[in-house]
Amino acid sequence: MEKSYSFKGSEAIISPALVYYRDLLRSNLEKAIETAHGAAHLWPHVKSHKISHIIRMSMEYGIRRFKCATIAEAEMVASCGAEHIVLAYPLVGPNIKRFIKLSEAFPDTHFYAIGDCLDMLSRLGEAAQSSSLGNVDVLVDVNMGMDRTGVPLSELVSFCDSCASIDGITLKGLHCYDGHRTEHDYHDRKAQSDHVDRELKPLLKSICKNHPTCSLVIIGGSPSFPCHADFILTDGEETKNAEVYYSPGTVFVYDYGYSKKFPDLPYIPAAAILTRVISNPGRGIFSLDLGYKGVAADPEGIRGQLLGVEHCEEMFQSEEHWTFRMQPGYEDTCPKVGEEFFVIPTHICPTSALYPSVTVVENGEIVDEWEVTARNRKITY
């Protein structure tokens, strides 16, 4: 596996370095489009990479809608010319005015906010009415069982009714993220997803009947969106205009954590970290220049898959170092100072945010360097 991540010219790259593989990114994009039955059905999240080049690559494949976690990400996507952007994070404090200013700055892009709090949505509506916008489109954030954000299913219909009376906002649909759908077995994951979908569909029918503009449904994450791929609303007059979109994020770059946890997903990690041995502090021991300032420190457990070294085990990791010990009997095969290796991050999303730019490789050669555009919390607005 490690041979596919090696490339010419790596000796000149400062380590640790995050490397993206353009051919693998394209392959993952194509697989996601196939699963969604076409690019027009995808509304992908950009938080895993935060890179404008990948937005433009996605648009080359026909993807026109994107989901963001920060206003900086939304600005990056809008700057690429995306047609529809949902800021999938509750707006509180100064972020309400920031969202309004961003929407004003990009009039050709259709922005959506999400919300699960009537007071917050009222504040958003007031801000919209005081601006040149006059109105903001809103998706109700639905608690699909994760209990992180969102309106519980039992309160969804009444909440939407209340939203409809708020001046300055227009109810446009539902944001249905189920990040807790992490069952290892696809059939278990599918069964759990289907169970919630069966609860959601009649609620959506009622909401669409009462509020015809509420026609968008953005559903699923990377592990679950294949389970929702048959979430088709053709069983009634009320939902005939409903549009369903699937919202993976990690699948485009992918990582070791997902590849280990979800063997049914067909994606290949398209990012790796170039690292080097910096010390042999004892027989059979080696330290890499890859601490938790260079690879995400979550989740608990192994923080990445070290390629090209067998029969070794992790000792500990600190800010700038990652130390391993060879297993008994393999001490003589211990990597030497200066040797290069590649690590597939367990969690690519926070790892990407640790680097100002990524080296881009295709067909074993360096072809570009991409800025991690939305790494910071603020760009302009």
Locate each region found by the language model.
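Generic N-terminal amphipathic, Lys/Arg-enriched alpha-helix
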Residues: E2-Y20
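Active-site loop/helix belt of alpha/beta enzymes
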Residues: A127-G134, N143-Y258, F262
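Active-site loop ensemble at the mouth of alpha/beta enzyme cores that anchors a bound cofactor
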Residues: F225-G308
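Active-site-proximal beta-alpha core segment in soluble small-molecule metabolic enzymes
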Residues: H45-Y186
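N-terminal glycine-rich anion-binding loops that anchor highly charged ligand groups
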Residues: E2-Y5, L24-I54
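Conserved, mostly hydrophobic/aromatic
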Residues: L25, K47, V77, V140, ...
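C-terminal accessory subdomain/extension
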Residues: P281-Y381
